[in-house]
């Protein structure tokens, strides 16, 4: 439950950081 949700939140945060730093990459591949 909570641990999985926390990991998902971390993944979303990392994706946000990456997409904000590299907005020109093709993220449709992810």
From Swiss-Prot:
Keywords: Copper, Oxygen transport, Secreted, Transport
GO cellular component entries: extracellular region
One GO MF term: oxygen carrier activity
Subcellular location: Secreted, Extracellular space
Domain of life: Eukaryota
Tissue: Hemolymph.
Cysteines engaged in disulfide bonds, as pairs: none
Family: Belongs to the tyrosinase family. Hemocyanin subfamily.
Job description of the protein: Hemocyanins are copper-containing oxygen carriers occurring freely dissolved in the hemolymph of many mollusks and arthropods.
Record protein name field: Hemocyanin subunit 2
């Amino acid at each position: 439950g909570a641990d999985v949700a926390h990991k998902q939140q971390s993944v979303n945060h990392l994706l946000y950081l990456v997409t904000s730093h590299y907005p020109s990459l093709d993220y449709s591949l992810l």
